[in-house]
UniProtKB/Swiss-Prot annotation:
CDD domains: Ribosomal_S12 (cd03368). The modification 3-methylthioaspartic acid is found at residue 89. The lineage of its organism: Bacteria, Bacillati, Cyanobacteriota, Cyanophyceae, Synechococcales. One of its GO terms (molecular function) is structural constituent of ribosome. It comes from Synechococcus sp. (strain CC9902). This is Small ribosomal subunit protein uS12. GO terms for biological process: translation. Belongs to the universal ribosomal protein uS12 family. The gene is rpsL.
């Protein structure tokens, strides 16, 4: 416990909060170009082939981003928009690709949670 004299001499230093998505550089989204689109297997209790892409961002970072939803049209050189948000069972994946923007198509025949997957309202 510091004395009052010690606190007058040097004030308490504030704790620095470490960002969970440094590649975004305090922006809500970032544009980037896919350098590689591939599948990855999740951590221990889960089993699947998760679709991910390696993306070179305008901020200069190269990150791994998750492609949500069923089916996608991404390939190398596709221009995508990424947002923050990690995938718990994929180590090193801290970003999501936003569906329905730039070169990323929305999910076909999606009826629920459509806004999250860039799907238009179904024709009735």
């Amino acid at each position: 416990m510091p004395t009052i004299q010690q606190l007058i001499r040097t004030e308490r230093s504030r704790l620095k909060v470490k960002t969970k998505s440094p590649a975004l550089k305090s922006c809500p989204e970032r544009r980037g170009v896919c350098t590689r689109v591939y599948t990855s297997t999740p951590k221990k209790p889960n089993s699947a082939l998760r679709k991910v892409a390696r993306v070179r961002l305008t901020s200069g970072f190269e990150v791994t981003a998750y492609i949500g939803g069923i089916g996608h049209n991404l390939q190398e050189h596709s221009v995508v928009l990424i947002r923050g948000g990690r995938v718990k069972d994929l180590p090193g994946v801290r970003y999501h690709i936003i569906r329905g923007t730039l070169d990323t198509s929305g999910v076909k025949d999606r009826r629920q949670s459509r806004s999250k997957y860039g799907a238009k309202a179904p024709k009735e």
